[in-house]
Amino acid sequence: MEAKKENLVEFQKRTGLQVNPDAILFFWPSRLDPFQKGVDLLEHIAQHFVTVNGDAQIAIVADGVGSDRTHADILGRIAYASNGKITYQPFSESLSMLGYAAANDVFGASLYEPCGQIDQIGNLFGATATNRDTGGYHDKIRELRLKRDGSPQDVGNGFLFRDYDPGGLWYALTRSIAFHRRSLKIREMQIKRIMKEARERYDLGSMIAEYVRIYERLNGGRPLA
């Protein structure tokens, strides 16, 4: 967790966020596509979410679709008015990787998603994953439930929402921030488990087999070869 704090501070310095190693960082790495990725839902709630949740920060490192700057401009204005609680940056591979390494939660709001990868990368970097319960995210994000809260065992790697509206995204992020406010001991135990399970699940052979399975399903169940 100390390494994540170091990455967080470096990310904050590079992006103009308030420097606070104890902030809870929500990282959006998906392209700014209102037809698939749900960026309009993010725009509706971002400012209010960081106002209500004083320990939260939101970072977006992404480009629009093609030459469309509509949502980049909207998010830029939201970030400018946030007093260092929200940052928008155009996509850069190095900055995006640092964002994953700094994040507590990697999130999105997809209307549909055949596969999706941001949850996998986030888990590998020690972040929970939050997204809409659809497609690949339905298959890969499992609700985080803890034995100490009554679950038979510690399971899950993130948080899902069903309704494609701002309230749905708000609901899932609120559940995520509640987890990230828990004691260091609890968080550290679960993040280590999530990272271990992600490494086991997303080794190269397993990932190839999973993608073949998904594309065969999209192909009407017919084998690809």
Language-model features: where?
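Conserved donor-binding/catalytic core segment of Leloir-type glycosyltransferases
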Residues: Q18-Q36
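Glycine-rich phosphate/pyrophosphate-binding loop
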Residues: M1-D22, W170-K185, K196
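A charged, aromatic-enriched C-terminal amphipathic alpha-helix characteristic of glycosyltransferases
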Residues: R182-R213
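A conserved mid-protein helix/loop that constitutes part of the nucleotide-sugar donor-binding site
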Residues: P34-Q47
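Catalytic binding pocket for nucleotide-activated donors in carbohydrate/polymer assembly enzymes
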Residues: L98-M189, A198
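Nucleotide-activated donor-binding/catalytic signature segment of Leloir-type glycosyltransferases, i.e.
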Residues: N53-L98, V155
